[in-house]
UniProtKB/Swiss-Prot annotation:
Its main location: cytoplasm. One of its GO terms (cellular component) is cytoplasm. It holds the Pfam family EF_TS. CDD domains: UBA_EF-Ts. One of its GO terms (molecular function) is translation elongation factor activity. It is found in: Cytoplasm. Residues 84-87 are annotated as: Involved in Mg(2+) ion dislocation from EF-Tu. This is Elongation factor Ts. It comes from Caulobacter vibrioides (strain NA1000 / CB15N).
Amino acid sequence: MAEITAALVKELREKSGVGMMDCKKALAENNGDIEASIDWLRAKGLSKAAKKADRAAAEGLVAIATAEQGAGETATAVEVNAETDFVSRNDLFQGAARQIAGAALGTDGSVDAITAAKLAGGETVQDHLTNLIATIGENMMVRRAAKWTVENGVVASYIHNATAPDLGRIGVLVAVESTGDKAALRELGRKIAMHVAATSPLSLSPDDLDPAAIEREKAVFTEQALESGKPAAVVEKMIEGRIRKFLEEVVLLKQAFVMNPDQTVEQLVAETAKTLGAPVAVKGFTRLALGEGVEKKQDDFAAEVASMTGQA
């Protein structure tokens, strides 16, 4: 049997990312063969990965990738989830998130297409994540994604609470169409992206807003106005005013720009168009906040201790 040296254990640990004791055991089981030990660890890890698949993955990273496309650009934002915030600082996980966002550029931007996309090494995104689950020991998944493309202009991006370049807890894309100067368009797009990160608008314009959301607010405002006991004509004007204020709060183009509340985002865009001497239009935006809508499991510490000591 080959001697299991510290150097061998270190090499296997660096290649696999697995703990030293597991590496030592793998080498012992495979007569010191590094490649066979890696396969052994993968097989061992994969058997555990299925058990981890039902754990809530509400942490992780939002990754962004951008590529020029003729006179325009395409960009993707991908939310890759893991179970703990600790993993988001892991180099392997960060590298995977970047690779996945890059692979998403060549897809239609749907989660199914992204998980089926192939990475540079030839394996699919899903296979890569499955192997990473085995290595790191946490459930991981591509939860949400978005892709924007403009034929002329830029897709600006912004990462809030960045862990590393193009990686963080909130990722925003803003598609800006124009034949104007790209540097100026990118500055405009980034400012709007920062605004979106801060205000979380529901839609780009009033026409894009879900009619059900408007009706819901209108019902609330109507009830409040009727309780005032004022004449019907006055009540109608009150409702109109409150709906207008609601739109100013949740519609991006109607919102007061956070960096200059004296103007709306729509006015900022018009001002930029005038300066550039070319039409400028915000085509759309996406805001991905890590773990948004995921119900995190609240562990019962006493029950956990009891189960570990066999007292449950």
